[in-house]
Amino acid sequence: MKLHFLSLLIISTLFNCKNDGNNSEGNYAYLGGEIKNPNSDFVVLSKSDVVIDTIKLDSKNRFLYKIENLESGIYTFYHGGEIQMVLLEPKDSLLFRLNTFEFDESLVFTGKGDKKNNYLINEFLENEIQEKKIFKYCQLNPDTYQRRIDSLKTLKLNKLKAFKAKYAPSSLFDKIAHANIDYSYYSSKEVYPFVHYGNNKGAILKSLPKNFYSYRKNINYNDYFLKEHYPYNSFLKYSLNNLALENHTTHSNNDVFKRSSLCYNLDRLKLIDSLINNETIKNKLLYYFTANYLLKSTNTEKNEALVSAYLNKSSDETDKNEIKRFAASLNNLKEGGTFPSIKIVNYNNTEFDINSLIKTPTVICFWSNTFYNHFKESHYKLNELKVKYPEVKFIVINVDNYGLDKPKAALKENNFKLKDEYQFKNPKESLETLAIHPMTKTIVLDKYQKIVYSNANIFSMNFEEQLLGAINRK
């Protein structure tokens, strides 16, 4: 691995030397990498939702790419369903290595531009850990909670100050790093009433100090520069949840707040439409909240009402068509309905219609190499359930479109048996038909191939109760 990266670095340096004389402005950068356990044979590079190029991996799963006429800023590379951001500035020669089984955790940058990008990825990972602490802190009273998160913000600012003193990064990096700290902090404030114990969220909001959300007056909800930044996008979602809640409590007669309330979700779409003017940001948020509602709802009439509101507000025709197809797929998976005919293949490449396998109460689960931790944890859980419920058939389907060899190897490497393991014959079509999102989605059927639960989760506290309901159906 080190030898591979040394060779990449030498190649990058040679390219720099060769081209510096022909590009006096130095308005270019190199991005290269090596991917262990690749999910495909290419990476996609983009900026601001515009694809720059699709780059093939070589025989050693490496690539090196020169970006001409570089516009300094955040670039995105996609590989096998995973996404990573990198900050590129003129004359950067940035190299990375990663393992798809632990995408973010394994990502390491080297070369010119590595310090700032390693700082940003480490900050992202630290924020993921810190988020769990913040959810615990949310049970504190508002003043104590404020002091805790203020302290965390101060630590981050001190760390950034030390980094700047040592490496003297650009003003662009400084802008991004400060925005990440600020918006992570603001998210901590916005999430408080939702995570704080108690169902009367309106009362919790009223109990907060008057200046608790004073920063909002300085927030730009249409910041095009930050539109692809994770902390900013997370903040927007938390803040819109909160602002919609404030509005909802003014006309709701129910003290017990329900996130699944159609009224609340319609309030939120209306708020997005009125507050956000940038079409890109607005359309993404409208899509996100509409899809999220549909995933958790089994009420067709309410789904239609929300979809109608969404279609009237979004200007993205591609997104609108996706939402319509998604809603139609969910409608076809109504509880009590017949499971659709789906072709699957086992690891001997034998094809089946999935309904031909359903003769007893059945649980259908899904996994992907992209979500490797979920793959392992779900199989451990399924092994437990198979022992406890021998009368239930468990069908486990890999949703990837990489052929049989890669998922088969993953199963064998982890000592998981191949019995009852399958792949979709037509992954793209089947994913859409079954509306598989998130990957934890589990479908429970009775022995008559009727859908009992279309959106269960083997990790939920009431899953075994749901399973017993399917078993005991007459």
Describe the function of each predicted region.
Residues N373-N414, N426-L431:
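Structural microenvironment flanking redox-active thiols in thiol-disulfide oxidoreductases
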Residues T13-N16:
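C-terminal motif of bacterial Sec signal peptides marking the signal peptidase cleavage site
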Residues D319-N355:
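N-terminal "domain-start" segment that seeds a small globular fold
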Residues A410-K447:
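Short, internal strand/loop/helix patches
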Residues N19-L172, S188:
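A non-transmembrane, solvent-exposed segment enriched in polar/low-complexity residues
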Residues D223-K296:
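Long, charge-rich alpha-helical interaction segments
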Residues V444-K474:
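Thiol-/selenol-based redox modules, centered on thioredoxin-like
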Residues F352-L382:
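Short active-site neighborhood of thiol/selenol oxidoreductases, capturing the structured segment around
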